[in-house]
Structures are given as structure tokens and as C-alpha cells.
Amino acid sequence: MSFIDPYQHIIVEHQYSHKFTVVVLRATKVTKGAFGDMLDTPDPYVELFISTTPDSRKRTRHFNNDINPVWNETFEFILDPNQENVLEITLMDANYVMDETLGTATFTVSSMKVGEKKEVPFIFNQVTEMVLEMSLEVCSCPDLRFSMALCDQEKTFRQQRKEHIRESMKKLLGPKNSEGLHSARDVPVVAILGSGGGFRAMVGFSGVMKALYESGILDCATYVAGLSGSTWYMSTLYSHPDFPEKGPEEINEELMKNVSHNPLLLLTPQKVKRYVESLWKKKSSGQPVTFTDIFGMLIGETLIHNRMNTTLSSLKEKVNTAQCPLPLFTCLHVKPDVSELMFADWVEFSPYEIGMAKYGTFMAPDLFGSKFFMGTVVKKYEENPLHFLMGVWGSAFSILFNRVLGVSGSQSRGSTMEEELENITTKHIVSNDSSDSDDESHEPKGTENEDAGSDYQSDNQASWIHRMIMALVSDSALFNTREGRAGKVHNFMLGLNLNTSYPLSPLSDFATQDSFDDDELDAAVADPDEFERIYEPLDVKSKKIHVVDSGLTFNLPYPLILRPQRGVDLIISFDFSARPSDSSPPFKELLLAEKWAKMNKLPFPKIDPYVFDREGLKECYVFKPKNPDMEKDCPTIIHFVLANINFRKYRAPGVPRETEEEKEIADFDIFDDPESPFSTFNFQYPNQAFKRLHDLMHFNTLNNIDVIKEAMVESIEYRRQNPSRCSVSLSNVEARRFFNKEFLSKPKA
């Protein structure tokens, strides 16, 4: 039976934009007036401006001493057809100091019909004639993908990966336990999750991945999802030129060397100057800049210093043949004045796509950060390097550089990152990058001549760099406001219609809801206001959005894996989150994930926090659906926590420690020791600290391989009993209004 993906038939409503094309053809008899022409021959150019579109201002090149210029230059504007769009045409004269306006005219775009193309003459000063060619068409192929379904590339990956996993599971589990794997359809979907926790999470996850690789578990996984510190390890691993041919063991040796150095070495004046020069280039191109950009550079220099030009898109070559699990990364979109725990949209990143499932909007990775309007790119920038994304994914730790540098807390209110930059730049900076302004919209028409400006731009840049360095090492709001710490990108959903809300689980009313009452949903895990505003939409009028570390809401990347389109059967999660002590209950983040899932009607096994009281601290806990027959879509969760229990006694599973040296190396606490090197804010790991944490999680994982294997066998059996695990019957559809009419009218087989 072929698999039908019902999600591809759900309509994600969006309105098509219009593309307005203007060709500036020519002008004749350009004049500065009788007196002006006596003094100088015009150097004409044309400015085009439409205030209702983000990339609003365009200009032609200028011709020296030419009263009959022929430009033949083409410009495109993406327009909202519901707006009153007016084209302002300005004829300019380029001068060395200040350009001069020679005349203006306007054209109402709504006077044209879609599909129409015509030449329109404009008269300036009763003498000059300028001719423009204009055309209007519908943008029927937006750059955003509007869909609730997985992208075709991920679907192809899943099919290829299932064949690989089927053989790997047979080898791992043996003939008896894998006899249910008759075809790829019987293969359960296994996901591995890593939490946040700074370098502690990164180092711990390195030990986990080594164990999963050696044991063969990694070959049975479809996804590896990370958050914050875990994404740093995933980025290091997947960007390594020798992975997956070379396993984590050798790559982890390189990692240990990289994190043994003092991070202050990365903040020498010479290196900071290089960082800021890169930021100058980015800012000058019209992109927002925050301290997260610098933080990403520092993380990149530490972990992937010899591949700083690597991009997320380039990681596709690691997964295109399905030889390793698909990596999934995450950050949050947040609102400037609302707690992340109250409101946050989860943004997912893969080598194939970046987007927000809540709105059914996705884009190719190389478009993230570009300027969009109504789903169409209006200004494309170079793809952000992987280290920039690493800074965004772990941006909560950008504040730690206050501590590293000894910067005291600034109490200045209302001082944004952009205002801070404005204070230390000159008026010649290309864009002021204010949080919600459009640079081009606010440029004065009489601007300095570009050629003249180039003569002293380098001096201004040098001054900007000098002041930026001073800001980095002084008491600065750059460090002390969310505006300064949070990443910021152009809003790729600018101008979209979000009147329709799309639940993350639009197709089913899961039976798990029956066992989860309103009192439980109202019960607070960490904060009385947690998730209070998660149903609110993104502001589609804001020109830029804040993107921050997902750990600021909860520290496990379950939202990526719980998308029903991915149909995950078994989740193996590793939680490196900080706890008050080694003996503290380890379920806070998991309980937050459970509550978030229930509020989004996503299947999740009941988490019983009292298992800690009954069984004490363990290396891992297993949570299963209470009633598998009724909860067919509910995954099983194996939850590993950061705990040093059996590792103190055994150097390998079943192999006791014998010498005093072996016992001493394993005798350490993680959270109880006030001198512990495993603090969330520690970004330097001596070799011994690295090996201790790495080997601890390597041991804990290997020590529970049988638990993982048993869960895999059960997942195979669940698949056998529920062959339509990934598909959804229309009889279970909760929100049929989302389906297109053609799909609903088809006869049911």
C-alpha cells in the first residue's frame, strides 16, 4: 500500500503579491534650469521609491555631463495589491558634496492591470522628458513554502534512511528481535535529543554520540535534534570534513584540544578588530547586527576555526545519501517585551529547510536573513555562515561575556543595540538598522555622492571599529539589554496574512488528552505564566524579528521531534540541564516539554515525577504510553539525565575499577562541587574535566544500551500492530476546514 501524506493537502492560506517591474529607459533635455546649466552640465540619475514595500528605494547609475542619458536599467518591487502603491520618480543631479533634486513625478500602480506592460513618459520642468517601461504581474511562485507537510527533500531522506535503518536494526537486534522488519514500512522512527547547557551539554553530548556510534544505535536513528550547547557539538560533528567516515572518537579528540584554551585569547584587539570589520560589512549591506553576531564568531573560532565559511546548506552532502541521521537545530522567535516562557515560536533548522511549523512557512536555508515581503524575497543576502547560527542557537550564553570580561550591569533603560551602534558610528554608515525602520525609506533624497563618500569611508570605518572595541571592553548596554544580546534577522513573514491559525497537530484529536485534565494543564511547572501566550501570532508588520536560544523557554528540543508529520516512535533524550544539586529531581525540563505538548495537542507519555521518590536517581528513565492500544501515536521516551552513579565503580559496563587512580578519576560531583568545572558559564575545559564528563556520558549511554534495544523491539511491534502509524484517517480529522476542496471531494477507497 502506498503512503499518502494528508498534510500536503492542507491549505496554508496566503495572499499572492504583485511584482511591479520598472525599466528606466532614457531621458532627454535634462536641465538644471537656465542659470544652473550655465554653471554646470547635469550628471543625471533616477531614484524610484515606493513607501509601501520593504526594499523601497532604487536608483540608477549616474552619467557625467549628459543631458540625454540612456539607462535601460530594470528594477523590481514586490507589492501588496491591497495597499495604495504609489511610485515616486525623482530626477537627480550627482554632485561631489550634495546631490540636487531636478524634478519629481508620481505614478499610481493601481492604474495598471495585471499582465499589462506599457511605456509611460514623464515631463519635468516642462522641458525634460523621461520614459519608463512598466509591467505588473502576480508573484505566483513565492520563495516561502506554505505547507504543513515535510519538504520533499526530507521525505526522500526518510525513505532512503529507512532502508539503511532496517539493515542496521537487524544487525543490532538479531534475527529473533527484528523478525517484524519485513519492509521499510515496519521500521520505527527513532530520534536522539540533546539539551542545552553550554559547554557542559556540548561535552556531554560528545560522549553520548561516541557511544551511540560505537554501539550501532546511531545507525538506527532517523533524527538527531539539538538545542543550544548540543547544537554546538552537532555543528562541530556534521561540519567536520571526515564525518561520517571518521567517527566521533577522533573528532572528539580535536574538540578537547579546542576547548582547553582560555576564551579570552579570542578577544585580543587584533581579533576583535577582525570580528568588527566583518560586522561592519554585514551592517553596511542592510542587515541587522547584534552581539549575537560576535558571540557566534567566538563560538565558531573556538569549535570550527578552520571551517568558518561553512554554511547550514553545505551539510546536505552529509545526509543526501541518508548515511547518517538528519540533524535538526532550533531557536525561538520572541517578542521584545514578553517573557520567553510566556510566548515563543519554535524555529526549526535543517540542512534542507528553515521555518516555523506553527505557521506552515518554510524557506531554503540560504534565504534565512534575507529581506522578504509577502513570501517573496525582495533583497537576498549571502547565506549566513554556520557560526552565526551557532551564536543564535546558543544566544543565552552571550551574556556570559559580561562575566568573562568583568563588565558590570548597565542600568540604562531604552538603549537598544541599534542606538548603541548609532552612538559610535558616523552619519555616513549606510543603514541605521533601527529595530523597526526601513533604512531606504528614511534616506534623504539629497545624499552625498557615492564616489565622494568612498574617499573617507575607510576612515569612518576605522573610527567605528575603534569605538566598537571600546564598547566591547567597557560598561555597555550592548551586553545588558535583550536588544543587544538577542539575535535579529529580517522578518521572513513580513506582510503575510495570519488570520488563520494552524495547530501543530491539525489532523487528530489524540486519545492522550483523555488522561490529561484541565487542572494538570493549569498546573505550573516553573512559572505561573508559562506558555500563557503561545497561541498568539507573530507580528507580520514588524520588519525584523528577535531570535534567541530555545533553552530560554525549556531546555529540550521536543517541539522539533513531536511534529506528527515526522511520526517518531522512540525518543532518546539526553538532559544536561543544571540542577540545584546532584541529588535534585531531574524532570523539570521534561515536565515543561510535556505541558507544551499537551497544550498543542501533541501525543506525549505521562511523565510521573514521583518515580524519582520511588526509584531514586538513575542514569535513565523510561516513559511509555499507559494504554498503547488507545495511544497509538504516542512515542516512548528514554530520558537520560546527568548523573554520576555507576561510573564511580565501573570503568566500562561490567568492568569494575581496580586501581586508586581509576577510582579517583571517577570520583567527582557535577552540581554539588562549588569548584566544579561543569558550570553552565564555563567555556574552558581542561583535558581532565573534558574526559571526565565525556567518559561519564559515554559510560551511562553504553550502560543502558539494553534499555534502548528493548524499546526498539517494542517500537517494531507497535509498528507491526499499527501499519498506518504515519498516516491519518480522514475520520479522525479534527479540523477538516484546513483541507482543500479537491482533496475532500475525492472518493474514499
UniProtKB/Swiss-Prot annotation:
The modification Phosphoserine is found at S2, S434, S435, S437, S505, S515, S727, S729. Residues 6-122 form the C2 domain. It holds the Pfam family PLA2_B. Changing R200 to A/H: Abolishes phospholipase activity. It comes from the Eukaryota. Its EC number is 3.1.1.4, 3.1.1.5. Changing C151A: No effect on phospholipase activity. PANTHER family: CYTOSOLIC PHOSPHOLIPASE A2. This is Cytosolic phospholipase A2. It comes from Homo sapiens.
